[in-house]
Amino acid sequence: TGMLAGNGTIRAGVKGYAPGKLSKEEVHQVWKAVEESLAAGALGISLGIAYAPEFEYDRDGLVEALQPLKGTDIPITTHIRNEGDGILLALQEVISVAEELQIPLHVSHMKCIGRKNWGETPVKILKLFDQAAERGVKVDFDLYPYLTGSTQLVHLLPPQFQEGGTDAICARLADPSCRKEITKVLKQPSDIFENIVELAGFERIYASTLHTEKFRSFAGQSIAKIAEQFGQDPYD
């Protein structure tokens, strides 16, 4: 039993929630933090590349940031970038990262979001894992035996609208024109980001934990139901 070092925590410590690629100096700071974490006893590196600020990494950026692990038996465990319409591309991305670095890969909470992705997609996923194993990649995954997933409500937003941290997000949501732009994106299927709104619908997205006292009575209700009580469009 042990701990993993969080790649997102490391990146946030180096660059905060600022958008864009890491500079060379920032990459070296990330390497130092990774090496220090491993020296302190971390058993591997945990990634959440669907989430801020890690979604700022592209595939090559991940390979660069994880160079201290190259050729070791130190694993990466990752929430993939997209568990919906783009799940196969998202899996190919992390498999290719592990393969280039020659390190073990564990995919966290393997699932297909959206009923339209339940049919042949799981078969294709298993084929990807089998093909990777045949090439010598050490790869596995975990899953939970129920249909409900969980995440932060902010993760419903497209990645470009999450940049800059909480204050920047709140400023965007307070702007009617920005909300209109967000709504337009959320109403379209995407293999670029995990569009949970389009995949599940507001009637299947529930608020489970609300920290503000005046809103706590809405815990356990769907976003669609909450919006109805406020007389508002769920997208707002």
Question: Which residues does each predicted region cover?
Answer:
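Mobile "lid/hinge" segments at catalytic clefts and subdomain interfaces of large enzymes
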Residues: G2-G8
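Divalent metal-binding pocket/active-site signature
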Residues: E36-E93
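Active-site neighborhoods of metal-dependent hydrolases
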Residues: L4, G13, Y17-K24, V30-Y51, ...
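Short, amphipathic alpha-helical segments
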Residues: K24-H28, E56-R59, L88, G119
